[in-house]
Regions:
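Amphipathic alpha-helical segments at domain termini/boundaries
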Residues: 1-7, 17, 23-24, 31, ...
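Sparse, context-dependent recognition of short Cys/His-centered cofactor- or disulfide-binding micro-motifs
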Residues: 2, 13-15, 85, 100, ...
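A structural preference for short, pocket-lining loop segments at secondary-structure junctions
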Residues: 4-53, 57-81, 103-108
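Glycine-rich beta-to-alpha active-site loop
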Residues: 33, 67-122, 149-150, 154-155
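Glycine/Thr-rich beta-alpha phosphate-binding loop at enzyme active sites
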Residues: 47-55, 117-126
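Glycine-rich phosphate/ribose-binding loops and adjacent secondary-structure elements
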Residues: 77, 118-137
Length: 218
């Protein structure tokens, strides 16, 4: 199977299963493990062949699947840990999340997780309000968008990603377990429906349409 197509179909199936059958599970944790270079190579193939019908349909499926995650009324946490592959298309999972935590390993740069942007993060997978997730994140401000675009292809460590505004927090290995535990326990202590409306407001903070108003809160 072709990885981008298989990944999109399996992710879509997982989202629909969780939304339909796990109604009491109010927080979802998003992780991506593997070879970031392979993800970027896949993105390069998508970009180079974007006018081919199969690639065009695959990009469309990825766009719809990620948009389905955006309008899921659950709290989304992305954990960028050692061995993570949040690069290019998979980095969109971190940008979908309400909070993204990235592990900082200042004493072991070789093992530190990296976040890598590609051209696919700039408009190929728009949200249901027609913004890219980076545009939404930076309120369409020119300076941070240009800074992010200038980092395309760079393997960003936690400090660099935090400086660019790409992650919520970057705890070091001493604080990581407690920071993540507290964040998840805080959310789990509330009703699954308690914050979903507020989080949907933040996900679509600039531009709303009927899809965001209805599906983002159901």
């Amino acid at each position: 199977a072709w990885w981008p197509l298989q990944m999109a179909r399996e992710l879509d199936d997982a989202i629909l299963h969780m939304r339909t059958n796990e109604l009491e599970m109010g927080a979802w944790v998003l992780k991506a493990a593997g070879d970031a270079a392979a993800v970027l190579a896949s993105d390069a193939v998508l970009l180079a062949n974007k006018d081919h019908w199969l690639v065009r349909e695959t990009i469309g499926l990825l766009r719809r699947t990620l948009a389905r995650l955006d309008v899921s009324s659950r709290s989304l946490f992305a954990l960028i840990e050692e061995g993570s592959a949040f690069a290019g298309t998979l980095a969109e999972l971190a940008f979908c999340a309400d909070r993204a935590y990235m592990l900082a390993l200042p004493d072991d740069a070789a093992k530190a997780p990296k976040l890598t942007l590609s051209e696919m993060n700039f408009g190929f997978f728009p949200m249901v309000n027609d913004q890219s997730r980076l545009q939404r994140r930076f309120y369409e401000e020119t300076a941070p968008m240009e800074a992010a675009r200038g980092a395309i292809g760079q393997a960003l460590d936690a400090d660099a990603a935090l400086a660019l505004g790409l992650v919520t927090a970057a705890p070091d290995d001493i604080d990581w377990a407690d920071e993540v535990r507290l964040a998840l326990e805080e959310r789990a202590s509330m009703s699954p429906d308690a914050l979903t409306g507020l989080e949907a407001n933040l996900r679509f903070s600039q531009k709303e349409n009927m899809a965001t108003r209805i599906f983002g809160r159901l």
